[in-house]
Amino acid sequence: AITGPNLIDFVDDELMPYLEKFKGRAESPDTIEYKIGEIFGEIRNKFQSGYSLRDALEHVDSLQFRSQEEKHELSALYEEKIKRMGNAGRNGGEYYTPRPLIRAMVQVTNPTIGERVYDGACGSAGFLCEAYDHLRSTDLTADQLATLQGRTLYGKEKKSLAYVIGIMNLILHGIEAPNLIHANTLA
């Protein structure tokens, strides 16, 4: 396994550009390939040490998320990190709406399969994730699940970091190719 400066060079010069090209090769914006390309077009490698990056990669590689419950636990940790960023005065808080408020909004709107749920300033996509969990709480047919996955949840986000956070949050919740658009809703 490569490490040190060679690993940083590989990530910066080969891996990130390769993943960014997924967007151009994707069949449509509705695919996970397109979303991967968008994500890697928005982010940059923050690691300066290839040794630290190798340690992080080995730690992540040891994690196993086989069940839906384990994946949900990862998404909860992810949202907690976003929340803490905001509480520490960093910009993560502007993308995070407290979960109890989101749950109340979903309970009041009570979305059903076949309806569309839209968040025009989705930030971390917490509202869309909660709506997804609400809709998944019932037994769904294969057709209903396909509708939920591809034709129910929509969002827009203007800021690049929030857009990437929202995409990742939806993927961690189980939405294979989130219908988020990186755009200004009011423009």
Regions found by a protein language model. Give the residues of each.
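Non-catalytic, mostly N-terminal accessory regions of nucleic-acid modification and defense proteins
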Residues: A1-I113, N179-A187
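Conserved S-adenosyl-L-methionine
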Residues: G92-A187
